[in-house]
A protein has these predicted regions:
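Helix-loop-helix hairpin linking two adjacent transmembrane segments in secondary transporters
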Residues: 129-178
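Conserved MFS/SLC helix-loop-helix module at the cytosolic interface between two early adjacent transmembrane helices
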Residues: 50-88
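Cytoplasmic helix-loop-helix junction between adjacent transmembrane helices
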Residues: 94-133
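Cytoplasmic membrane-interface "Motif A"-like loop-to-helix N-cap segments
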Residues: 61-71, 268-281
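C-terminal transmembrane helical hairpin of 12-TM major facilitator-type secondary transporters
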Residues: 273-320
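Extracytoplasmic gate region of multi-pass secondary transporters
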Residues: 19-20, 208-250, 256-260
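Residue-level signature of mid-helix packing/kink "hotspots" within the transmembrane helices
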Residues: 17, 45-53, 138, 253-261, ...
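A late C-terminal transmembrane helix in Major Facilitator Superfamily
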Residues: 327-363
Length: 389
């Protein structure tokens, strides 16, 4: 089940990242400004703000199997429709559609893990699951300009190709995802259909620990989406070819895969997880600043550190939510919906502000300062976490 969920999360990462390496040809073909392109790359995050919470509740009621199937189908449609865009409005709408299917996947896969795994296994499984999205992003960034675009001939055909790949993955889940392993305890498999939900949402809203993690999540999405969506263009303006810029950005994502796998395991060795989160935020801010100001070896070091420390935040925050007594497997969909709904405010603002500040100042450096300042400032929130967290 973890491997099937990984494939769907791979499709998720592939689809949402595919626009980033194609920014230049899309802007030229459709006549878009940097502000418009920033709005496009942040469109699905904007929809997340309104869709994630109700979809999280639906996932708790509908179950993981149907939810992940619907999510995989919708994000594949989002990719296909991007190829038909003739202007800003059409491209914005097709990317925004991802904000309907995306939550079904990004909330559904953690719920899948919370049902199938317990204890330390959840940390490892969350890291592996997160690597699916990261590998999808890495493939989109590393292969789009160097292999896929030359093969299919046009940026529109790239989106068609990735959409068909997504539909293929949805078909695999349709055929195999509904058959739980006989080694899985029945009470765990059935828990998704027999939840006790009285007063759940009201109790969740009163939990201070959940809100602190949500605030940190806002900045994670701000930095992650803001940097990943614009890094290829930043590197191109520093003199890299589109293919090399894609390779470099995929290297950041590969570093993020390692961070997602290593840091959650390391986290269990420490009594104070807030120290882990504070370290991730501080180093991420430094790395982002180095990317904006550095050249040569320093630039490469910044790319590697930004990927490792920024990406590692996601599984750490997810595991902390899972392990809260008020959450667990039973209410992970509801809490995940809250996390993504509010967190994706940052997911929209990151890409949008990077594009807007580029138009205003004619430099990406102002956007880099914005991301760095927000990341560093959020370390204050870690002080409010309970010491046992």
């Amino acid at each position: 089940m973890l491997s099937l969920g990984w494939l769907i999360y791979f499709s998720f990462g592939l689809t949402y990242t595919a626009t980033a390496p194609l920014v230049a040809p899309i802007m030229n073909d459709l006549g878009l400004s940097y502000t418009q392109m920033g709005a496009v790359t942040g469109a699905w995050q904007l929809v997340y703000i309104f869709s994630a919470q109700p979809l999280g509740l639906i996932i708790d009621r509908l179950g993981v199997y149907k939810s992940l199937l619907l999510g995989a189908v919708v994000i594949s449609f989002s990719s296909i429709l991007r190829g038909f865009a003739t202007g800003f409005e059409g491209l914005f709408a097709s990317v925004a559609l991802f904000g309907i299917g995306g939550p079904m996947v990004s909330i559904g896969t953690p719920k899948l893990i919370s049902i199938w795994f317990t204890g330390r296994e959840r940390g490892i499984a969350s890291g592996i699951n997160g690597s699916g999205s990261a590998v999808g992003s890495m493939v989109a960034l590393g292969l789009t300009n160097s292999m896929v675009l030359p093969l299919v001939g046009d940026w529109r055909n790239v989106f068609y190709f990735y959409g068909l790949l997504g539909f293929s993955i949805a078909l695999v889940w349709l055929l195999l995802g509904g058959h739980p392993s006989p080694n899985t305890p029945a009470k765990i498999v059935e828990s998704s259909d027999k939840n006790r939900r009285s007063n759940t949402f009201r109790e969740i809203l009163k939990n201070r620990g959940i809100w602190i993690i949500v605030v940190i999540g806002i900045v994670f999405f701000l930095a992650s989406h803001g940097l990943q969506n614009w890094l290829p263009r930043i590197l191109e303006l520093k003199g890299s070819s589109p293919a090399n810029a894609g390779y470099a950005t995929s290297l950041m994502t590969l570093s993020g895969v390692l961070g997602s796998l290593v840091v959650p395991r390391f986290m269990y060795r420490l009594k104070h997880r807030r120290l882990v989160i504070a370290t991730l935020l501080l180093v991420s801010g430094c790395a982002i600043l180095v990317i904006g100001m550095g050249e040569g070896v320093c630039l490469w070091l910044g790319i590697l550190l930004a990927g490792f420390f920024t990406r590692a935040l996601m599984p750490v925050l997810t595991v902390m939510l899972m392990e809260m007594p008020e959450v667990g497997a039973e209410h992970m969909g509801t809490v995940g919906g809250l996390f993504f709904s509010i967190g994706e405010v940052g997911g929209f603002l990151g890409p949008f502000m990077m594009g807007y500040l580029k138009d205003v100042t004619d430099s990406f450096l102002s956007g880099i300062f914005f991301l760095t300042t927000a990341t560093w400032a959020t370390t204050i929130a870690t002080v409010l976490l309970k010491s046992k967290d």
